[in-house]
């Protein structure tokens, strides 16, 4: 506990402390002796002084706030009452602020303890234990609500009424000295400091961090921000502005003190120390949340400017009229003949109409085409006169840019899906599809006549079943050529079929992947079945023949 040597005196407490009279049940707790008569005299003198000093106050306020006593024995009543309330355990609700952990001391004279006798020596010890409250009796009789600067700078701090109190006064601590964590409990025996010879203060863990000054504060749980809104019935100390100020008042209670207080009381009852405001009322810079200044940087401005410039350029380009290139000879011919072709044909597709126009253009003679070439030359001359600075590159570049802007997301998705298809499908068709490995199906089809040659052979391969009918269906000429090949390949020997076949037919047969159970590995006796199936091959498409054979 911080100690302060002030000019001594008889006043040991504030004039707002609570005093219990003998008729309230304290006479039984005190030791019988000489203290009773002295206490009665003290009470009478304090009442006279209070009536003289606070003539403007009402009787209720006088009863609520009796002045302090001026003799050495005056802390006994207060301390006994504090100890009784401590025993009742009705007041330990937690301190409203952590700056006053030493303001309530148990009654040292009222307890029957062998180490603390109830005689004047203990009272002298109590006076030494409260050096901060020592002041002359004449200075303690001044009005508590309007203390003079001299009184505040040198003497005891007096209790102010709540509505006269500055809201930041409870944050000002007594001293910047810290509590010694290793001192044993000092309320049992007075410990004298070997350096100064002054008795040490009691241990912080044995003291209540709250100072009960009025009966209205009994049993009330103070608000966490009660130091900002002073309430009636909860008077607080006004501390002298000079000499006792701590640079960070809420941090005056060190870690050992906070641990001792929290060990005595439950965590939800002891609020954490407030560290929000400085003594001057200005928030500390380390506590205030930093506000980042939003200064515009060059990196943030440049993209916006570039975007704006791009938008302006695009708008200017859009405002310019699109100049078409001059028509060539074929375009002039299409422009002239398109209406005739549409009238002659019932087709409405532009692609088909363009094909017809292209065939007719190539069927024209040179003389007829020369007429349109001459018209195209005149068109170019007129265009160059109208637009001298125009070039075909302008339109070409614009169109390309527009296509990239419009089709960039779609083309990306399209290419992704197309790659997926390329990855999945070739693995199925690369080996068993003749179209992928040996050219188109029209040139070298997988013939189902080989399957007809052997009834036990499968009807068609997997690739043939997967392909549409348009690829597997062949005209009658194809069927006749294949049947002729089989007729020419008829031989009683079973050595090698490709040696007796004609070279193109043998190559076409061997170049296709044929199942192992096909006609090549079958005995030659099954070939008459192929001859019997020739009328069917000539009359029906191949796809229908293969399905009927299944």
UniProtKB/Swiss-Prot annotation:
It holds the Pfam family HMG_box. Residues 444-463 have a biased composition (Low complexity). The keyword Metal-binding does not apply. Residues 1-60 are annotated as: Interaction with CTNNB1-A. Residues 108-311 are annotated as: Interaction with AES and TLE4-A. CDD domains: HMG-box_TCF7-like (cd21996). Residues 17-32, 51-76, 406-415 have a biased composition (Basic and acidic residues). Coiled coil: none annotated. Residues 1-76, 182-206, 390-473 are annotated as: Disordered. It is found in: Nucleus. GO terms for cellular component: beta-catenin-TCF complex; chromatin. Phosphorylated. Phosphorylation by csnk1e promotes binding to ctnnb1-A while phosphorylation by gsk3b may reverse this effect. Transmembrane segments: none annotated. One of its GO terms (molecular function) is RNA polymerase II cis-regulatory region sequence-specific DNA binding. InterPro entries: Catenin-bd_sf, CTNNB1-bd_N, HMG_box_dom, HMG_box_dom_sf, TCF/LEF. It comes from the Eukaryota. Residues 407-550 are annotated as: Interaction with CTBP-B. Residues 1-11 have a biased composition (Gly residues). Its main location: nucleus. GO terms for biological process: canonical Wnt signaling pathway; regulation of transcription by RNA polymerase II. Residues 323-391 bind DNA. Belongs to the TCF/LEF family. Participates in the Wnt signaling pathway. Binds to DNA and acts as a repressor in the absence of ctnnb1-A and possibly ctnnb1-B, and as an activator in the presence of these proteins. Required early in development for the establishment of the dorsal body axis in response to maternal Wnt signaling. Interacts with csnk1e, ctnnb1-A, ctbp-B, dact1-A and gsk3b. May interact with ase and tle4-A. This is Transcription factor 7-like 1-C. It comes from Xenopus laevis. The gene is tcf7l1-c.
């Amino acid at each position: 506990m911080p100690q302060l040597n002030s000019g001594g005196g008889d006043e040991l407490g504030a004039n707002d402390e609570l005093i219990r009279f003998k008729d309230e049940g304290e006479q039984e707790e005190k030791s019988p002796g000489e203290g009773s008569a002295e206490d009665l005299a003290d009470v009478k003198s304090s009442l006279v002084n209070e009536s003289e000093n606070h003539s403007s106050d009402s009787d209720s306020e006088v009863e609520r706030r009796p002045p302090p006593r001026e003799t050495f024995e005056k802390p006994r009543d207060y301390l006994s009452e504090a100890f009784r309330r401590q025993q009742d355990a009705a007041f330990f609700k937690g301190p409203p602020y952590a700056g006053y952990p030493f303001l309530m001391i148990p009654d040292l004279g009222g307890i029957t303890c062998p180490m603390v006798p109830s005689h004047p020596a203990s009272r002298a010890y109590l006076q030494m234990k409260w050096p901060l409250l020592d002041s002359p009796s004449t200075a303690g009789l001044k009005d508590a609500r309007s203390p003079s600067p001299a009184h505040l700078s040198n003497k005891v701090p007096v209790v102010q009424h709540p509505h006269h109190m500055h809201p930041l006064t409870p944050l000002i601590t007594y001293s910047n000295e810290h509590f010694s964590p290793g001192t044993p409990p000092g309320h049992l025996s007075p410990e004298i400091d070997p350096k100064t010879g002054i008795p040490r203060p009691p241990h912080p863990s044995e003291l209540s961090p709250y100072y009960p000054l009025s009966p209205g504060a009994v049993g009330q749980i103070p608000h966490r921000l009660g130091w900002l809104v002073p309430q009636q019935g909860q008077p607080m100390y006004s501390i002298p502005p000079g000499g006792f100020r701590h640079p960070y008042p809420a941090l005056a209670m060190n870690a050992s003190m906070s641990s001792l207080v929290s060990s005595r009381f439950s965590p939800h009852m002891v609020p954490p120390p407030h560290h929000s405001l400085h003594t001057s009322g200005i928030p500390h810079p380390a506590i205030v949340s930093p506000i980042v200044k939003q200064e515009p940087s060059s990196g943030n401005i440049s993209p916006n400017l570039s975007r704006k410039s791009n938008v302006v350029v695009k708008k200017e380009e859009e405002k310019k009229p699109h100049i078409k290139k001059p028509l060539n000879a074929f375009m002039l011919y299409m422009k002239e003949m398109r209406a005739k072709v549409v009238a002659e044909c019932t087709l409405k597709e532009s692609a088909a109409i363009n094909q017809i126009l292209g065939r007719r253009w190539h069927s024209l003679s040179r003389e007829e085409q020369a007429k349109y070439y001459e018209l195209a030359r005149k068109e170019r001359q007129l265009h160059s006169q109208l637009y001298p600075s125009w070039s075909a590159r302008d339109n070409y570049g614009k169109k390309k840019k527009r296509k990239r802007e419009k089709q960039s997301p779609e083309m990306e998705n399209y290419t992704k899906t197309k790659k997926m298809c390329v990855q999945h499908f070739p693995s199925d068709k690369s080996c068993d599809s003749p179209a992928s490995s040996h050219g188109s199906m029209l040139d070298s089809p997988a013939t189902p006549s080989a399957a007809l040659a052997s009834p036990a052979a499968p009807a068609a391969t997997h690739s043939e079943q997967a392909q549409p009918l348009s690829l597997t269906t062949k005209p009658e000429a194809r069927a006749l050529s294949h049947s002729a090949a089989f007729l020419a390949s008829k031989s009683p020997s079973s050595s090698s079929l490709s040696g007796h076949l004609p070279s193109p037919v043998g190559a076409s047969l061997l170049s296709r992947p044929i199942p192992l159970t096909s006609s090549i590995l079958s005995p030659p006796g099954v070939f008459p079945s192929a001859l019997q199936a020739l009328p069917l091959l000539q009359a029906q498409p191949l796809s229908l023949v293969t399905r009927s054979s299944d």
